[in-house]
From Swiss-Prot:
(2E)-4-hydroxy-3-methylbut-2-enyl diphosphate binds at H41, H74, H124, T167, S225, S226, N227, S269. Belongs to the IspH family. This is 4-hydroxy-3-methylbut-2-enyl diphosphate reductase. PANTHER family: 4-HYDROXY-3-METHYLBUT-2-ENYL DIPHOSPHATE REDUCTASE (PTHR30426:SF0). Binds 1 [4Fe-4S] cluster per subunit. It comes from Pasteurella multocida (strain Pm70). Disulfide bonds: none annotated. Catalyzes the conversion of 1-hydroxy-2-methyl-2-(E)-butenyl 4-diphosphate (HMBPP) into a mixture of isopentenyl diphosphate (IPP) and dimethylallyl diphosphate (DMAPP). Acts in the terminal step of the DOXP/MEP pathway for isoprenoid precursor biosynthesis. InterPro entries: LytB/IspH. Its EC number is 1.17.7.4. GO terms for biological process: dimethylallyl diphosphate biosynthetic process; isopentenyl diphosphate biosynthetic process, methylerythritol 4-phosphate pathway; terpenoid biosynthetic process. CDD domains: lytB_ispH (cd13944). It is an enzyme of class 1 (oxidoreductase).
């Protein structure tokens, strides 16, 4: 048996930045540091930060007045920002800059009174934060997850409409929804470039290539990670058995029966150490070769806030 590693895989620039913000805040300010929601959707990462003194909460009422709080990479609503200000909380914002870009699109629509349609998954924290950027009662923001949802929209063709998307969606599914929106509302406006982020796009393209060469695709990522789920779904759609796992402990040896090539990738919030532990476990189960796809190079870097930049002194 052999392993083929997808490339690119694992951490993206937004996740790197979010984790660095929590780590730097702990180093500079000490614990406790409060984090609203899991800073990224990965159990291994969150547990590691928790051990270092980060306290993860779901709502700001769990944070003492005047404390330091970090907003997760998924972003928050304007109401949450205002609550933090009212509570005199010291905020470090780990929202991914690519999510912030979508927030700005929604805020612009809100100011103009343009009705906005967000393509995304209901209940996902990124969606909640993005919809929370719209505060104009004369307009409105509406969530659709599928082509079927479009028929339920009570909007008119003559309405001033715009759309935007969650950053971690399936490229194929989103393209279908956008096309259906344009058919129903020919005058609808949208971003010049798809809001799905570069990392999501690159990892889905890598899985396409991986699935063509594999009998089994293993995606390393947490169950609540949107982009990890999309990777597993994509491999399945291509006719390959796919498994989404947190770590090597989730591997079932029976998966390897009649398998000669195992493809491995990782969601944007899964660290490389987990991938390597999966490789090691599979080698114990009989894998003899490890190869890696050439893929594309990613060199995007997002800076942490200035006051959290740690300068090494020689």
């Amino acid at each position: 048996m052999k392993i083929i590693l997808a490339n690119p895989r694992g951490f993206c620039a937004g996740v790197d930045r979010a984790i660095s913000i929590v780590e730097s805040a702990l180093e500079i300010h000490g614990s406790p540091i409060y984090v609203r929601h899991e800073v990224v959707h990965n159990r291994f990462v969150v547990n590691g930060l928790r051990e270092r003194g980060a306290i993860f909460v779901e709502e700001l009422h769990e944070v003492p007045d005047g404390a330091i709080v970090i907003f997760s990479a998924h972003g928050v609503s304007q109401a949450v920002r205002q609550e933090a200000k009212n509570r005199n909380l010291k905020v470090f914002d780990a929202t991914c800059p690519l999510v912030t870009k979508v927030h700005m699109q929604v805020a612009r629509a809100s100011r103009k009174g343009t009705k906005a349609i967000l393509i995304g998954h209901e209940g996902h924290p990124e969606v909640e934060g993005t919809m929370g950027q719209y505060d104009n009662p004369e307009g409105g923001i509406f969530l659709v997850e599928s082509v079927e949802d479009i028929a339920k929209l009570g909007l008119r063709q003559e309405d001033d409409l715009t759309f935007m998307t969650q950053t971690t969606l399936s490229i194929d599914d989103t393209s279908e929804v956008i096309e259906a929106l344009k058919q129903k509302y020919p005058a609808i406006q949208g971003p010049r470039k798809n809001d799905i982020c570069y990392a999501t796009t690159n990892r889905q393209q890598a899985v396409r290539e991986l699935a063509q060469q594999s009998d089994l695709v293993i995606v390393v990522g947490s169950k609540n990670s949107s982009n990890s789920n999309r990777l597993a779904e994509l491999a399945s759609r291509m006719g390959v058995v796919s498994k989404l796992i947190d770590d090597a402990n989730d591997i079932d040896p029976t998966w390897l029966e009649n398998v000669t090539t195992i493809g491995i990738t990782a969601g944007a919030s899964a660290p490389e150490v987990l991938v390597q532990s999966v490789v090691k476990r599979l080698q114990e189960l009989g894998v003899t070769r490890v190869e890696e796809l050439q893929g594309c190079e990613e060199n995007t870097v997002f800076e942490v806030p200035r006051e959290l930049r740690i300068t090494e002194v020689n």
